[in-house]
C-alpha cells in the first residue's frame, strides 16, 4: 500500500531522518522529518497553472505547532489551536526567506508549504528541522525549485562554535544564529548575539554553512529515489521586449533616478512608464503584450538601470556615495506625560517610539510547547499605510510587522538590565510615521533612545543600519543605509544592529550565488562604520539611562521575606494582601522565592505597603521603641497593639514614672502611645513599658536610671 523511502544520517550527535511515501500522499510533496525525537510533517502543493492576470509569485508558508506534540491540551475556552502564535509567524518567515529566491523568475503558480510540528522532545527546537523538511518536500514535489536548501543553528559557548545546540545549552550561549543556504551559497541568516565582533559572526555563518552540507546530501539522496518528475516550466523570454523598451526609456529613466526627492522621482518614473505603455499599447491596434508583462519588464529595467548607475558612478539614487548615511535627527522626551519617548528621523524614514514601564502584573504569559514562561520585554512595531503615502488596511499586525518588531527586540534585549537591577516590565511601541528604507533599524535606534529617556539603565546604546550589496561579475558595491528603492534591487540585503563594542543582531538575505566570505567581510566592516556613525548622532540626544524615572512612571521597591512567611502576607483566601492593596493603593507582586515587588507612582504608598508587610513578617526587637494603640485596659495595665498585628501588655507599674492607682487615669482605649519592648516573660508574652519613653516625642528617656531599673525589675 505504501511506497516508503527514507534516508537517515547522524547530524551533530543526533539522528536526522527524512521519510516520504506514507503520509500525505495526495500533496505534491510530503516529508516526515525527525531530529532526536522531535518530528515535523512538511507538505507542498502547487497549482498546475497560474491564475489569469497573476503578476507575482503567490507563495505561502504556514508553520504550525500542535500542543499534542508536547503532551498538552490548549488553554482557553475552546481547547483547540487558534490564530498563529508569534513563534509560528516568525518560523513561517524563517522558512519562506531561503526558499523564495530559489523559484524560477516568472513562476506564478499558487504554492503553499505547510509544516506541522507533531512531536516535540523538548530538546531540539523544531524550527531548523522544519526548514530542512520544507526544503526536502519541495525537492521531491516536482515543482520548479532550484534547491535543496539546508539549515542549521549555531551557538557560541566558551569561545567555541556549537552546531545545533540543545535547548538547555542555549542558556549558556552568547549567540543564537540560524543560517540556511544551498551547497554553494548562504541564503539567509537570523541571529541574536551578546556584543560579538564581525569576525565571530561571520565565522558562525560559515561554520553553519559547512555544518548543514550533510543535510543537503541526504535530501539529494532521497530525491534520487523518490522525487516526482519535474513539471514542465519554461520561463518566458522577454529579452527582445526589454531591449526595445531600453531603447525607448533608458535615457529618461536614468535622468529620473538622478532626482533625489522620493516623491518627485516617483512622478518622473511614472511619466516614463506612461510613455512606455503608450508605445506598446497604441490606440486602435491589437497590443502585442499584456499589461502585466509590460509592468514586469519595466520593473526589471528599473532595477538594471539603478544597478548600472551605482556600479558605474559609485553614486546613489539620492546623490549619496556608497558609504554615507542619511542625515539623522534624534530627539527624546517628545511626549512628556509618557514614561519615555523618542523621535528618530533618518532621511525620509522616521519613527515615534514610546516606552512604558510596568510591574510584574504586566508581564506577558507565553504558552509555548516547552512550557509557560513570562516575558518582561515587549516590543511592538506598527507600519501604517500613511508612512509611505498610501491608503491601506489597518488592524492586527501582519507577518512583516511581527518580524520587524522581533528583529528590533533581538537587537535591544542583550543590553537590558537584569530583573534584579531594574524590576520593571518594559513595553516599547514603534510607530513608523515615514518610511523610505529600513524602518526596522530606525525602530532599534528609537527604542534605545526611548528606553534611556525612561530611565532604563541599558548597558550601552544600540543602533542599527540596513545595508545592500550589488554584484555584477567581478564588480561589487556595498551600500550603507539603503533607501526603499534600493531595498529590492540588491543581491544581498542585510541589517546589523549593535553597540560600539559589537553586534547584537544580524539579519541577512542573499539572493544569488557568488557572494564570497571576503565580500561579506567587506560588507560587515562597512556596516560597522555606519553603525558607529549612527551611535554618534544618537549621542547628541542622550547617552545613558536617566538617573531618575519620569514623573508619571511607577516606582517599584523590592523586598525579600522568608518563604515560610508568604502565607501570612497573603492571608486566608488572599484577605491580607487585598487589604494592603486597598488601603495603601500600591500594586504588590509576590514571587514563590519570597521576592516582593511593591509598585506605585507615589512613594508614600510604597512606603506604607512596605511597612505593613514588614510588620507582618518581621519580629519586634528588644530595646526598640514602637508606636502603638491602646486596644484594651484592665486593672493590672493596658494592652497595646504595636508593630502591625502584635499585642503586648504595659503593666500598670510601667504606665508612668509616678505611681498609678488606676489604668484609666493614664490611658484609654484608642490612645496612641509610645512603648519600649522590654522583653518576654517565661510564657513568651511581650513586656512593654511606657514610662521609659517620652510620650510627647517618642524618644527614650535617657539618664532616668530609677525608671530603667524599675522597668527591668518588673
Swiss-Prot record:
Gene3D superfamilies: GHMP Kinase, N-terminal domain, K Homology domain, type 1, Nucleic acid-binding proteins. SMART domains: KH (SM00322), S1 (SM00316). GO terms for biological process: mRNA catabolic process; RNA processing. Keywords: Cytoplasm, Magnesium, Metal-binding, Nucleotidyltransferase, RNA-binding, Transferase. Residues 554-613 form the KH domain. SUPFAM superfamilies: Eukaryotic type KH-domain (KH-domain type I), Nucleic acid-binding proteins, Ribonuclease PH domain 2-like, Ribosomal protein S5 domain 2-like. Belongs to the polyribonucleotide nucleotidyltransferase family. It is found in: Cytoplasm. Mg(2+) binds at residues 487, 493. This is Polyribonucleotide nucleotidyltransferase. Its EC number is 2.7.7.8. InterPro entries: ExoRNase_PH_dom1, ExoRNase_PH_dom2, ExoRNase_PH_dom2_sf, KH_dom, KH_dom_type_1, KH_dom_type_1_sf, NA-bd_OB-fold, PNPase. It comes from the Bacteria. Residues 623-691 form the S1 motif domain. HAMAP family: PNPase (MF_01595). The keyword Cytoplasm applies. Its cofactor is Mg(2+). The keyword Ion transport does not apply. Involved in mRNA degradation. Catalyzes the phosphorolysis of single-stranded polyribonucleotides processively in the 3'- to 5'-direction. Its main location: cytoplasm. GO terms for molecular function: 3'-5'-RNA exonuclease activity; magnesium ion binding; polyribonucleotide nucleotidyltransferase activity; RNA binding. GO terms for cellular component: cytosol. It catalyses: RNA(n+1) + phosphate = RNA(n) + a ribonucleoside 5'-diphosphate. It comes from Allorhizobium ampelinum (strain ATCC BAA-846 / DSM 112012 / S4) (Agrobacterium vitis (strain S4)).
